[in-house]
Amino acid sequence: MAKAHKDVKKIVLAYSGGLDTSIILKWLKNEYGCEVIAFSADLGQGDELAPIRDKAIATGADKVYIDDLKEEFVKDFVFPMFRANAIYEGHYLLGTSIARPLIAKRQMEIAKIEGADAVSHGATGKGNDQVRFELAYYHFDPAITVVAPWREWKLNSRQALVNYARKNGIPIPVTKKRPWSSDRNLLHISFEGGILEDTWAEPPENMYVLTKAPEKAPNKPQFVEIEFKNGNAVAVDGEKMSPAQLLAHLNYIGGEHGIGRVDLLENRSVGMKSRGVYETPGGTILREAHSAVEQITMDREVMRIRDSLIPEYARQVYAGYWFSPEREMLQTLIDDSQKCVNGVARVKLYKGHCRTVGRKSETNSLFNLDFATFEKDQVFNQADATGFIKINSLRLRIRSLMQGKK
């Protein structure tokens, strides 16, 4: 055992219950010879969590935490991100990216409670998650020891992992292996790897979990009304709900209509491109409805400036900078812009499409029929537009005149 290993007395492991983190748990026990605490965050994975406690104990965990973080996840992580209308590279609603900071936060809280001197995760050395986890760890404790097995061990193939599992009595799932990996929470489910690495191949229909195939969705559209207060969704069809309940409800409705499927070849933080296929039914509906209420309540120039910040905000979330001062600065500006975003949006769901068909605000509407109508001239003198156009065209006319002299 290396000296660095001897210095570690207790490790808190972010444990999913899958084969990889089960192998990691046993490997930590074997290589570090210390106490290992397994921690699983309930972010809405569903049935996946049921066997985790027994599995962790059977694999060698000295203690197990399974914490229900669904409400905190949606209220303090998903909703702030949706107030920013964040979207990565035009398609990805950041379902995995936004989950990692919360998992790391609770993991570090457990480390403090338990007096652990190290934390560990199951992210590979090629992916984004190692960065997201570890940036968060160091935010909470700059001196924490991070154990990243994928960057240490020599188990560099799937067969090597299987052999290690067999040697150490770790159960290997007997169910037919699906040729892709997945990650699920209340905001989305993601798929990557395996057959999806063929960028020309269409994902098989049996891969999808949350959504019906659009062509098999109901032939009749469904209309949904979503109420917002200060930029946060608070009710669906007039029924008040908690953040997690609301998102779960929209996931079900959206899934029935095939809403929220995305197939993206994205740029990872580490520099390589990677294909991700995502199902985000509730999130897709929320973003559409939120934008609709903004249209009727938000000042034009405030919206323009906020919109210019969306790519940077999304990049920070994707790259793992949730706890950074720059993300917090942007959040302050964005949240100030959301004070007026109070109203209701009506969206139409039909065979994979989510479209706004109405929006209203009783308290913050900036739409005035007298100003906007094409039928009256009582409050807007159309002749005034002549001066407006001439002033705004000045730089273009000067440019044309100067080019004419060349």
Swiss-Prot record:
Tell me which residues bind L-citrulline.
92, 97, 128, 132, 181, 190, 266, 278
Provide the residue positions that the database annotates as binding ATP.
14-22, 41, 122
Single GO term (MF): argininosuccinate synthase activity
- One of its Pfam families is Arginosuc_synth
Q: Which residues bind L-aspartate?
A: 124, 128-129
Q: In which pathway does it act?
A: Amino-acid biosynthesis; L-arginine biosynthesis; L-arginine from L-ornithine and carbamoyl phosphate: step 2/3
Q: What is its main location?
A: cytoplasm
Spell out the GO cellular component terms annotated for this protein, sorted alphabetically and separated by semicolons: cytoplasm
Fetch the HAMAP family from UniProt: Arg_succ_synth_type1
Oligomeric and partner information? Homotetramer.
**In its UniProt entry, what is this protein called?**
Argininosuccinate synthase
Native species of this protein?
Answer: Geobacter sulfurreducens (strain ATCC 51573 / DSM 12127 / PCA)
- Gene designation: argG
